[in-house]
């Protein structure tokens, strides 16, 4: 499947990534993206920036190197109450919020705790997508969580970096099963490179392959076209982004 949007990318501001926003934008252009989301780690991750960094994204131009820039964050799920490490004052300056588990912030517990944390995060209404769910350290009830995500219009991320098999080892088969459950429940799917270096921006081939193999309806893949992604943001309650009105 052709994918026009990369919804999960990092700059050096994350503390363990190595490129600037301009470098990422250039790579996005070279790889044929229409939009990309800049989603550095929120402040609870070691080395991550202060929340002002995210609030101040309002100064970013809407286009860099001819590619549309979506202002975002990869927030950390903090607890079973579904709290995330992002000041609520930042919300109105962002377009896109991923909620993810990371071991340094949320110590792996048990399936019930992970399931509760994900469901409460979804119900909290502040995250637009759940990131890299395949991690076996954070097992959860696939059916229960994805059904909740479907009800609340929260997208399920297919993470290309995970599918390479080098990080979150043991995730690949789980990613395929998560995708199959998402297909059966007609949930929304998003795709992210999780790039920590600019050469990986737009690297979505493994995610695209998974989508094709599982047979997910392109209309449920919000990154299939820029317009589908922007329509999803509006479905989530975001205001239309005037500068992107002409994107297809």
From Swiss-Prot:
Highest taxon above the source species: Bacteria
Residues making up the signal peptide according to the UniProt record: none
Binding locations of Zn(2+) 1: 8, 10, 74, 194
Molecular function per GO: phosphatase activity; zinc ion binding
Keyword Zinc among record annotations: yes
SMART domains (alphabetical): POLIIIAc (SM00481)
InterPro entries documented for this protein: Phosphatase_YcdX_put, PHP_dom, PHP_phosphatase, Pol/His_phosphatase_N, Pol/histidinol_Pase-like
Gene Ontology cellular component annotations, sorted alphabetically: cytosol
Cofactor(s), names only, from the UniProt record: Zn(2+)
Keyword Zinc carried by entry: yes
Single Gene Ontology BP annotation: bacterial-type flagellum-dependent swarming motility
Homology family: Belongs to the PHP family.
HAMAP family named among the record's database cross-references: YcdX_phosphat
The protein's name in its UniProt record: Probable phosphatase VCM66_A0854
Native source organism of the sequence: Vibrio cholerae serotype O1 (strain M66-2)
